[in-house]
Amino acid sequence: MRFGVEFEEGIFDKICDLLKQCENKELKMEELLRLSLENGISSSDYLFLVLQELSSKKLIESSRGTVKIGKLSQEFEEIKKKVAERIKKIKKVFVTPLEIAKFYQCPRRLWLEKVVQSKQEKEKVGKVWDGEAVHLAVKLMIESVQKEKDENFLVLKACEEAFKKYEGMIQIEKRTLEEFLRKFLELIKEENFNFVYSERTIESLREGIIGSVDVIGVKNDEIVPIEIKYAAFKGRIKKEHLLQAIGETILVGNYFRKDVKYSFLVYFQTNSLIKVEVDEDLVRQFFKLKKQLEKFYSLGRIPPKSKLPNYTKRVCQGCHVKRACDNIEILRRMIRKI
């Protein structure tokens, strides 16, 4: 969570380098956006601001989803200043889809984690690190999937490196992780993705959202975000998981300037694959929660605890800032007695 935008010169330089590589070429806009993602350009809003300036100087032409890049001049310094000025005027609260999901669960928990930055007490061995190992293994596998054709080698290598990094901290069995990775590869093949990316940070300056999407699949005219959950699927998707998935579809859709029709939730413990259709009502709920979050934290008060049914088990039990929250409640009881 953060307020406003700082102009990132590194992203601007990456855009300039990419456009120079594409001089005297005509590209589909989708291809240019994909190349931007591959080159670590986290926000396509930066790219479009630069393209607008180049278009005003008649250095590029665009029509019907294509862009023709001419011979670029040495005017990037002037363009940089103009783009920087426009970006510095953006006064929004930027949140991640995961933070919206956490806010839905418990406003106070997110406040303690992100605003107060209370000490988080994480277990030294167990679920937290099991989840980290699963995500790392998927990331390593995806990064090599288009280079290495031996799927068995891909799975074993990714699994081995994840276990090596989290040695002594995880409880999952290697065979279980290997089976999960193989099934994940099947999903990629069945969906017939042309390109697959893992843990790419994406930012929407327009919507005030930033986040790292576990996996993004690209095929023909479709973009599909995939969120991996270490949890078990018990027949019904939790609302917080839906909100995170919807937030990621908004992020990815904004980046590629496309309507994302669906995403996937993949549950590790039950090896379940759930397709999440984009629901406009959920999109409205996501932005409503974002506004509530901004209002809560601008008041400078301690937010309330979770109001979800059975929240003590559902939210408090695994909370990393439970001790800080308990101390707030103890202090409040003491004040009431005075």
Language-model features: locations:
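Short alpha-helical basic/polar micro-motif
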Residues: 52, 246, 317
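Mg2+/Mn2+-dependent nuclease catalytic core
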Residues: 34-38, 185-295
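A general structural-boundary detector
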Residues: 18-19, 121, 125, 202, ...
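Short, charged/polar micro-motifs that form catalytic or ligand-binding hotspots
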Residues: 40, 124, 128, 234-239, ...
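Metal-dependent nuclease catalytic regions and adjoining charged, substrate-binding loops involved
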Residues: 2-7, 43-46, 69-77, 205-208, ...
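Metal-dependent nuclease catalytic cores that hydrolyze phosphodiester bonds in DNA/RNA
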Residues: 2-52, 59-218, 338
